[in-house]
Amino acid sequence: MLLPKRVKHRRQFRGSMAGKATRGNKITNGEFGIVATEPCWIKSNQIEAARVAMTRYIKRGGKVFIKIFPDKPVTGKPIGVRMGKGKGNLECWVAVVKPGRVMFEISGVAEETAREALRLATHKLPCKCKIVSRADLEGGDNSEN
């Protein structure tokens, strides 16, 4: 599972997920990708499950790129513990994903193989996603300007 090697502060505020992704919203390495359409937290084990689903489907061909990293710690208190007495223990690491963020990319395989592998990966993720190609995103940017 993915997690940071070391962090300056072990506990963070929850933060907000308002707005759209301004960075990481283009396909840079692969030909096809998964783009988030709603904001969510994606746990490190969900990222790993999506990666395994894709790599098992494409077998030896192609390459998978993971474009998100879980760098936000999430804490929780045990069930049956009263309020107060400090912040809870570290439970998991999450990646904060905003709408428009490219989460996974795939290259080196045929289009139908890539789309099926990405479809399998979207079922492992907690947010609504869409599968896009590099041409889709580049075409969308030109029409807006």
Swiss-Prot record:
GO process terms (BP): translation
CDD domains on file: Ribosomal_L16_L10e
Record InterPro entries: Ribosomal_uL16, Ribosomal_uL16_bact-type, Ribosomal_uL16_CS, Ribosomal_uL16_dom, Ribosomal_uL16_sf
Swiss-Prot/TrEMBL keywords: Ribonucleoprotein, Ribosomal protein, RNA-binding, rRNA-binding, tRNA-binding
Molecular functions per Gene Ontology: rRNA binding; structural constituent of ribosome; tRNA binding
Gene Ontology cellular component annotations, sorted alphabetically: cytosolic large ribosomal subunit
Role summary: Binds 23S rRNA and is also seen to make contacts with the A and possibly P site tRNAs.
Subunit description: Part of the 50S ribosomal subunit.
Family note: Belongs to the universal ribosomal protein uL16 family.
NCBIfam families, alphabetized: rplP_bact
Name of the protein in its database record: Large ribosomal subunit protein uL16
Species classification: Bacteria, Bacillati, Bacillota, Clostridia, Lachnospirales
